[in-house]
Amino acid sequence: MESILTSIKLLLGIGEDYTHYDPQVIMHINSVFSTQLKQLGVGPEKGFRIEDDNATWMDFIPEENEEVTWDGVKSYMYAKVKLMFDPPTSSSHIKVLEEIIKEFEWRLSE
């Protein structure tokens, strides 16, 4: 299974081997894990955090099921981290990302 950090970096357009922004990306990923996803009831009850590129999506959600899919969680994580780490300059693009986030929050909370 793929690394959480690596998959989000690639979605953000950051190369896997480029580590300069890792601390900031990790901070934003952990923020999403500790606040939004935990409040939505997704993932371990005690919470989850990463420290490097060793943590995988399988560590966060041990097995994919009908209620929560890895792709839904990954897309949600990407959209949230994108808004915090590298927000779009266009207000219409920001609005689209915010609407996507709301849709995923609704779907993940069911």
Model-predicted regions and their roles:
Residues 75, 79-110:
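Protruding loop/beta-arch "assembly-hinge" segments enriched in small, turn-prone residues
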